């Protein structure tokens, strides 16, 4: 099956070591594409068992080796969406659609999000409010941060980093049972998130 040279975009016949048009080393390209597909499959496996942070890591690696890997980019968008990062998800799908405008499931994902502009705006606002809560924590204004984070998580209950920050506030207050409950909710979204597990270990140690 012919492939396109990544350097000059020309269609080249299979089996060639170098692009006949620009001289690009196609062996390197094939190796990169193979590694990209390998990391995509690892990312897919992790996503299926809700190891979402692990999936994000694998899918980013996949795209590092082949930024044109549409399946990896679309799945990365889905995983971002599952962690409450709808804006990051939309960004990946828009890039995907720009790379492959036709017959791309990313178009459906974008349409579904854009069909609910109020919901998308609300999720976007929760990200901004999260950043404000983070600033409050850095300024030792944790009471205000906790109130904001509870509101954020009621509006965007998939936002993993929101659970982490609220749990950290509780840990600093030595309210370990509250922290444990919040971290358990985070673990239901992303089972093997390293931050969740590290915080749970700290809570259990108390």
Where are these regions (language model features)?
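TPR-adjacent "capping" and linker segments in tetratricopeptide-repeat scaffold/adaptor proteins
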Residues: 24-38, 113-128
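Helix-start (N-cap) detector for alpha-helical repeat units in TPR-like alpha-solenoids
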Residues: 33-37, 70-71, 104-105, 126, ...
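Register position in tetratricopeptide repeats
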Residues: 48-49, 82-83, 99, 115-119, ...
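Canonical positions in the second alpha-helix
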Residues: 62, 95-96, 152, 185-186
């Amino acid at each position: 099956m012919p492939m396109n040279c990544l350097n000059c975009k020309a269609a080249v016949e299979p089996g060639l070591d170098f692009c006949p048009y620009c001289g690009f080393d196609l062996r390197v390209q094939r190796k990169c594409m193979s590694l990209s597909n390998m990391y995509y499959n690892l990312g897919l496996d992790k996503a299926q068992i809700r190891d979402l942070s692990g999936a994000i890591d694998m899918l980013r690696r996949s795209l590092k080796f082949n930024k044109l890997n549409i399946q990896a980019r679309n799945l990365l968008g889905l995983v971002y969406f599952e962690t409450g990062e709808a804006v990051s998800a939309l960004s990946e799908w828009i890039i995907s659609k720009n790379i492959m405008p036709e017959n791309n499931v990313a178009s459906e994902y974008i349409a579904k999000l854009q069909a609910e502009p109020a919901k998308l705006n609300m999720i976007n606002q929760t990200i901004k409010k999260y950043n404000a809560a983070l600033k409050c924590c850095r300024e030792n204004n944790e009471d205000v941060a906790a109130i904001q984070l509870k509101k954020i998580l009621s509006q965007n209950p998939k936002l993993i980093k929101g659970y982490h920050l609220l749990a950290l506030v509780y840990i600093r207050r030595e309210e370990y049972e509250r922290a444990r409950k919040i971290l358990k909710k985070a673990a239901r979204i992303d089972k093997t998130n390293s931050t969740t597990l590290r915080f749970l270990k700290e809570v259990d140690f108390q």
